[in-house]
Amino acid sequence: MSTRTKALNAYRHGLRATRIAFRNDAEVLLAARAKMRSGMLCPPDPKLTTEDQIQHLEDVAVFLRRNLVQGKKVDGSSTKEPRYHLNIHKDTELGDNETIADPTARVKTNLKARPFKCSDKKQ
């Protein structure tokens, strides 16, 4: 595969990742895409090889898809503490503190998986 094709594929993956991560936030979505476009036209670290720059863009796309979750404050909450709606999607990594500390642990990506609670702590 040519370098041009790899770069275009990485750019498309980045655009898809921004669409997923910033789904309901047009201002941030446009800013992220503008930053990605400017990074493609004028790379921030020209010392890196083209292959390394493409790999960096792929890594950023994976990070956006798996690790970035936006929250939006919910109005009209009956409690004193504010409530937030989180944009958790099918690609969001769900884990607990033990899996974060252990790099070999498998991370749950299924939203049907029950999240870890403090009361679930093994005794």
Curated annotation (Swiss-Prot):
**Keywords assigned:** Chaperone, Mitochondrion, Transit peptide
Q: Name one GO cellular component term.
A: mitochondrion
What InterPro entries does its record include?
Complex1_LYR_LYRM7, MZM1/LYRM7
Where's the transit peptide located?
Answer: 1-24
Q: Which GO terms describe its biological process?
A: mitochondrial respiratory chain complex III assembly
The UniProt disruption phenotype note reads: Leads to respiratory growth defect and increases frequency of mitochondrial genome loss.
Chief site of localization: mitochondrion
* Compartment list: Mitochondrion matrix
Q: Which GO terms describe its molecular function?
A: protein folding chaperone
What the protein does comes down to: Assembly factor required for Rieske Fe-S protein RIP1 incorporation into the cytochrome b-c1 (CIII) complex. Functions as a chaperone, binding to this subunit within the mitochondrial matrix and stabilizing it prior to its translocation and insertion into the late CIII dimeric intermediate within the mitochondrial inner membrane. Modulates the mitochondrial matrix zinc pool.
Q: What else is known?
A: Present with 279 molecules/cell in log phase SD medium.
PANTHER family xrefs: COMPLEX III ASSEMBLY FACTOR LYRM7 (PTHR46749:SF1)
Which family does the similarity line name?
A: Belongs to the complex I LYR family. MZM1 subfamily.
Describe its assembly: Interacts with RIP1.
For this entry, the protein name equals Mitochondrial zinc maintenance protein 1, mitochondrial
Q: Which gene encodes it?
A: MZM1
